Amino acid sequence: MPRPRLLAALCGALLCAPSLLVALDICSKNPCHNGGLCEEISQEVRGDVFPSYTCTCLKGYAGNHCETKCVEPLGLENGNIANSQIAASSVRVTFLGLQHWVPELARLNRAGMVNAWTPSSNDDNPWIQVNLLRRMWVTGVVTQGASRLASHEYLKAFKVAYSLNGHEFDFIHDVNKKHKEFVGNWNKNAVHVNLFETPVEAQYVRLYPTSCHTACTLRFELLGCELNGCANPLGLKNNSIPDKQITASSSYKTWGLHLFSWNPSYARLDKQGNFNAWVAGSYGNDQWLQVDLGSSKEVTGIITQGARNFGSVQFVASYKVAYSNDSANWTEYQDPRTGSSKIFPGNWDNHSHKKNLFETPILARYVRILPVAWHNRIALRLELLGC
């Protein structure tokens, strides 16, 4: 029989049977990162790089080999998760029907007089749900209460369920295989973080209050990351992409003055100042903004944002994406279901972020945004995501 090192090389090239690879004691040189626990699985093939073992990750890590730190806020607080993605079993209505404590208010640190979700007092099994629109790793939840007429209201305990289709839900379990009850809050404002023992793969996440103080009032955030781990900012916001690599079809000049130009190099997410975005010089579907990434990269998504011009709100409401490796031959991103150019939903105001992830990542050096619809003028700030 070949020596173990040679056998390992052969197995990597030829996909050995599980029983053969187990003989190598693959877990002896732990292939799991970040403290992950390697466990052999006899007579099973997991289907990725190695058969016959699996990695159990520490809290806050995910991936086949626990290679990804996975505790990013998923978008409730910053608005990346839209109101339409948040639902609940019921809503409390107070103050003569004028105050509605609806689920879309349940965003961490939201301010205001009515700033959280509360279920109806008649709801015997309340829940609030987030639709992430795609499968993601979910690794934890941050909860917070709120107040009504100076009364502290919060969840003291809750359960978490998750689903891939929005119909069949599984609860997170404890070591005794029972539905795990997570510790909640102790006052109206303090935040409490619960990290799951293992990440869950989910598109839908539900919180079920089980014990509450005064009322089951909630603001919260989900923690996790993308399944493929390739959704990092590529350098627009942090300026690692130089100005000269951001170009456009045209640029608007307020009052026709060069001093008041809305240059393509300003199209950086969250850029501040009086002139803080790219604005096209004319209206029409022939306008575009182009980013040169410097080399071919895997691009998995985009975050867009509008801007304000002397009080006038302006943004791109929908757009297409084109990509190229030579800046001469362009391909428009296709909707995998229809086979036609995909139109992505854009923004609805001048400041919120709108994230769109590609179902099929693209490999390209040059990326163009092609506005389809807009409010007032074509105005854009953005970040590209990938690795």
Curated annotation (Swiss-Prot):
GO molecular function: integrin binding; phosphatidylserine binding
One CC-aspect GO term: collagen-containing extracellular matrix
PTM comment, free text: Medin has a ragged N-terminus with minor species starting at Pro-264 and Gly-273.
Disulfide bridges in this chain: 27-38, 32-55, 57-66, 70-225, 212-216, 230-387
Subcellular location: Membrane; Secreted; Cytoplasmic vesicle, Secretory vesicle, Acrosome membrane
GO biological-process terms attached to the record: angiogenesis; apoptotic cell clearance; cell adhesion; single fertilization
Short sequence motif Cell attachment site: positions: 46-48
SMART domains noted in UniProt: EGF (SM00181), FA58C (SM00231)
Keywords: Amyloid, Angiogenesis, Cell adhesion, Cytoplasmic vesicle, Disulfide bond, EGF-like domain, Fertilization, Glycoprotein, Membrane, Phosphoprotein, Repeat, Secreted, Signal
Annotated ranges, domain F5/8 type C: 70-225, 230-387
Phosphoserine modifications at: 42
Function (record text): Plays an important role in the maintenance of intestinal epithelial homeostasis and the promotion of mucosal healing. Promotes VEGF-dependent neovascularization. Contributes to phagocytic removal of apoptotic cells in many tissues. Specific ligand for the alpha-v/beta-3 and alpha-v/beta-5 receptors. Also binds to phosphatidylserine-enriched cell surfaces in a receptor-independent manner. Zona pellucida-binding protein which may play a role in gamete interaction.
Protein name as annotated: Lactadherin
Organism: Homo sapiens
